[in-house]
Amino acid sequence: MLLARMSRKDAHHDTARRIVEAADHGDLPTMRVTNYVVTETLNYLHERQEHDVAVELYDRLVQSAGFEPVHTPKADFSQAVDLFRENSGLAFGDAAIVACMQREDIEYVYSFDDDFDPVTGVTRLNTATNPFSP
């Protein structure tokens, strides 16, 4: 979702922009972003776009009240390895997200990546919808 937000050419750019804006304004739950996601996203932007785009995203993440960067503890890393081994369709970074979600008892992930769909206990959201609003 963060990559789509930063790439105007991405098919999901407008939707990602709406999700990020809603998070920034407090209309969505605070989005926890693991250090793996930050690393993966910044590296991608640095290599495929421009360094300044990667820096802009980092600054947005740490300054936004709608996002909370979190460090993945060793236990999550170990759980991510197990999830990665068990799920051939799940990238390691996604497995790390799921491990964090399981530890924190978080059900929802904002993502355009349907690799999360088969994971039990994870509900993927791809619109600026607050799952806790009636």
List each model region and its residues.
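Active-site phosphate/pyrophosphate-handling residues
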Residues: M1, Y36, A95-A96
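Short, well-structured N-terminal submotif of metal-dependent ribonuclease cores
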Residues: M1-R32, H46-E56, S133
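Amphipathic alpha-helical segments within well-ordered protein domains
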Residues: L3, L42-N43, V81
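Short, conserved active-site loops that position catalytic residues or coordinate cofactors/metal ions
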Residues: T34-E40
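Acidic, PIN/NYN-like endoribonuclease modules and their adjacent C-terminal/linker elements
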Residues: V38, E104-P134
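Helix-adjacent hinge/juxtasegments
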Residues: N43-V70
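Short, hinge-like loop/turn segments at secondary-structure boundaries
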Residues: R48-H51, N87-S88, L125-T129
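Active-site neighborhoods of divalent-metal-dependent phosphate/nucleic-acid chemistry enzymes
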Residues: P69-E107
